[in-house]
Amino acid sequence: MANNTRARRTARLSRALGIALTPKAAKYMERRPYGPGEHGRARKKQDSDYAVRLREKQRLRAQYGIREAQMTRAFEEARRTKGLTGENLVELLEMRLDALVLRAGFARTIAQARQLVVHRHIMVDGIRVDRPSFRVGEGQLIHVHSRSEVMPPFQVAAAGAHVLNNVPAYLDVKIDALQARLVRRPKRSEVPVICEEQLVVEFYAR
């Protein structure tokens, strides 16, 4: 029951934001390609600039499954970092451990990736890490604990069930061994998230 409720909530959020947050939500959106609620099919009035920026910020947050406080901290770090703030923001979020567990194909959704980390199934350079927000460094190896490899979710993952069609070039993935190495810092153009990051910057700079 809880899983069904969570799936419906995710599908509703996906429709509201206009992006599929999970594979199941993608199928749901194919059947109902309009916003949620009784007025979902109606043509929407022109959104205000604030509403457009807010929605873009919410889209980015939802794709990484993070809280507002985490998003704000990441933005402040991105703002202090040399380069374009919006690109920095996405690149920093992508270096989170849960994001890379998802991108490597160890999990089906960001929520599952976070759960795998919290339950101490994931290791970085041979050390168990249970913080989804852990920042993975260049050259570090992400892998599944040997005692966890035999569990059904990881057997499914090792068979390639969740592997992306195009694995980002910043990851060297050996899915059969349930290993992935962050070979370098991600570039915004390579990160498979849907976001106009400049609108997110404008939201926080208001």
Curated annotation (Swiss-Prot):
Domain S4 RNA-binding: 95-160
SUPFAM superfamilies with a match to the protein in the record: Alpha-L RNA-binding motif
Any one GO MF annotation of this record: rRNA binding
Signal peptide: none
PROSITE patterns in the record: RIBOSOMAL_S4, S4
InterPro entries according to UniProt: Ribosomal_uS4, Ribosomal_uS4_bac-type, Ribosomal_uS4_CS, Ribosomal_uS4_N, S4_RNA-bd, S4_RNA-bd_sf
Alphabetical UniProt keywords: Ribonucleoprotein, Ribosomal protein, RNA-binding, rRNA-binding
UniProt key word Flavoprotein: no
Ribonucleoprotein is among the record's keywords: yes
Region: Disordered, residue numbers: 28-48
GO cellular component, one term: small ribosomal subunit
Example of a GO biological process term: translation
Family matches, as Gene3D superfamilies: Ribosomal Protein S4 Delta 41, Chain A, domain 1, RNA-binding S4 domain
Homology family: Belongs to the universal ribosomal protein uS4 family.
Function, in words: One of the primary rRNA binding proteins, it binds directly to 16S rRNA where it nucleates assembly of the body of the 30S subunit. With S5 and S12 plays an important role in translational accuracy.
UniProt subunit comment: Part of the 30S ribosomal subunit. Contacts protein S5. The interaction surface between S4 and S5 is involved in control of translational fidelity.
Protein name: Small ribosomal subunit protein uS4
Organism for this UniProt entry: Paenarthrobacter aurescens (strain TC1)
